[in-house]
Amino acid sequence: MSTVVEVPVPGWNGWYARMDGSVRDPNNRIIWGSSNKLGHKCFYTKNPFGQYETCWVHRFVAMAFCPNPLPDVFTEVDHIDRDPTNNKPENLRWLTRALNQLNKKCKNCEWCRRKKRFRCFVTISGKRRNLGYFFTQEECSAVAFDFKLRELERIYMEILNAHHENTDG
């Protein structure tokens, strides 16, 4: 029989994070969490102040196992392998929001709660352009990729044309 290492979650009396990526609550129940639209595992419970809130399994595991050298700077927990279901401590690290966004599986996609779909967007010259709403991350990501590819081809052709105009004249 193998034993699972558990560590208390700081600030959450009676809560323990486990090496297998799960959490144990004060009633000794093992909590894996249910998946949100992006695959992150979450659960709903009372916080230490007695208010109900949505809690993220990966944050509990990171608080217990992954030292945060700069808590005021590194405010987000990143899944190194980009798999939001892999909440094992060796797959988690504390990052800034900007660094965490760089490691996203699906860039240029975000979940829109109001429309219950993924919003596809690109930023061009500092301006954000909405490309539409999609039911899956894959579809959203493909649209963003195609748009960027067309934009890259357009810019490439502009550069070539400008070069030819300068060398022909």
Task: Please annotate each region the language model reported.
Residues 1-76, 83-151, 155-163:
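Conserved recognition-core residues within compact binding domains
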